[in-house]
C-alpha cells in the first residue's frame, strides 16, 4: 500500500517536472521569436534604406550619363536629400527643409521650353519622353530622381522607410508632399520666356486653385522673366469644356498681370499622333 502511494507521488512529480519543462521551452521559444523578429525587422529596415538609396543614386547616375555628365555629384545630392527628413516625424517635414537639396542640384532649363501640367501626367510625360522641345519638372534631374517614389522616417530614427508613410493628403507637411511643393516652386521660379501648361479638358473644372499648379507654380512665375503662359487644354471629341470655362477666369486672376495669358484647345488625338510620330514638328502638336 505504502509503495503504491510512493509510486503515485513519484508519477505526479514527474508530470509536474514535464509540465514545467514544457512551459520553460515555450517561454524560451517565445523570447527567441521576439528577438529574431526584432533582428529581422531591423535587417529589413536597413535593407529598405539601402534599397531606396540605391534607386536614387542609380537614377542620378543614369540621368547624368545621358544628359549632363560632370555637373552634379550624386552622393552629395543624396546627402542633402536625406538630411531633410531623417529622424523627423513624417508629418513634420516642411518644404523649406529641402532647400539644401534644391541648392545641391545644378541644372539650367532653356527658356521657352518649360511645360507645367495638372491632371495630365501620363499624357504629358508620354509627350516629353519622345520630344526635346518641352520639359516638365519630372524631366529635370531633381524631378527624375524622386518621381513615383515614397519615403519617410521616424522621430530619432536613422532609417528611410518606403511603406507606412503618410499619403499626400494625410498631413500637410509630409516628406513627399513637401518635396514636390518645394521642387515645383523652384521649377516655376526659374522659368523664363513663354511657358505652357497642359490641362485636362475632360474634367468639369480643368483648372483648380488648390492643385500644385494653381497654388504653387502659377503664383511663383516671375513676371520679370516670364513673358507669357499658354494653357494647352487637351480635349476629346466628347468633351464640352472649352477655353471659356469659368475656372480659367480664376487662373487669370491668380496670374501676374504682367504675364500674358493665352489658352488653346488641343485635340487629344493630335497629341497621341505626335507621341507616336516624333517626326511631326512640335509646333504642329501643341
PLM features per residue range, with description:
Residues 18-47:
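Alpha-helical transmembrane segments in eukaryotic/viral proteins
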Residues 1-15, 202-215:
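Intrinsically disordered cytoplasmic terminal tails of membrane proteins
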Residues 31-40, 50, 58-68, 189-286:
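Active-site or metal-binding loop neighborhoods of secreted/extracellular toxin and effector enzymes
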Residues 34, 41-194, 262, 277-286:
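Glycine-rich short-loop/terminal segments
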Amino acid at each position: 500500500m505504502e509503495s503504491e502511494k510512493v509510486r503515485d507521488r513519484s508519477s505526479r512529480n514527474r508530470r509536474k517536472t514535464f509540465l514545467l519543462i514544457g512551459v520553460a521551452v515555450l517561454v524560451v521559444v517565445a523570447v527567441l521569436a521576439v528577438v529574431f523578429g526584432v533582428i529581422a525587422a531591423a535587417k529589413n529596415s536597413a535593407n529598405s534604406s539601402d534599397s531606396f538609396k540605391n534607386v536614387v543614386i542609380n537614377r542620378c547616375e543614369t540621368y547624368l550619363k545621358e544628359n549632363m555628365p560632370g555637373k552634379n555629384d550624386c552622393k552629395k545630392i543624396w546627402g542633402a536629400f536625406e538630411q531633410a527628413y531623417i529622424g523627423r516625424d513624417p508629418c513634420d517635414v516642411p518644404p523649406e527643409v529641402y532647400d539644401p537639396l534644391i541648392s545641391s542640384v545644378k541644372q539650367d532649363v532653356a527658356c521657352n521650353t518649360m511645360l507645367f501640367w495638372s491632371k495630365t501626367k501620363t499624357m504629358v510625360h508620354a509627350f516629353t519622353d519622345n520630344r526635346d522641345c518641352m520639359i516638365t519638372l519630372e524631366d529635370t534631374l531633381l524631378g527624375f530622381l524622386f518621381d513615383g517614389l515614397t519615403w519617410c522616417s521616424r522621430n530619432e530614427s536613422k532609417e528611410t522607410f518606403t511603406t507606412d508613410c503618410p499619403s499626400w493628403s494625410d498631413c500637410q507637411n509630409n516628406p513627399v508632399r513637401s518635396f514636390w511643393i518645394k521642387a515645383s516652386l523652384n521649377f516655376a521660379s526659374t522659368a523664363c520666356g513663354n511657358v505652357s501648361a497642359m490641362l485636362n479638358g475632360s474634367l468639369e473644372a480643368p483648372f483648380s486653385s488648390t492643385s500644385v499648379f494653381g497654388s504653387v507654380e502659377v503664383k511663383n512665375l516671375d513676371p520679370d522673366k516670364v513673358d507669357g503662359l499658354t494653357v494647352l487644354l487637351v480635349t476629346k471629341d466628347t468633351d464640352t469644356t472649352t477655353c471659356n470655362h469659368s475656372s480659367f477666369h480664376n487662373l487669370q486672376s491668380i496670374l501676374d498681370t504682367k504675364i500674358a495669358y493665352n489658352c488653346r484647345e488641343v485635340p487629344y488625338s493630335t497629341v497621341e499622333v505626335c507621341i507616336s510620330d516624333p517626326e511631326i514638328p512640335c509646333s504642329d502638336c501643341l
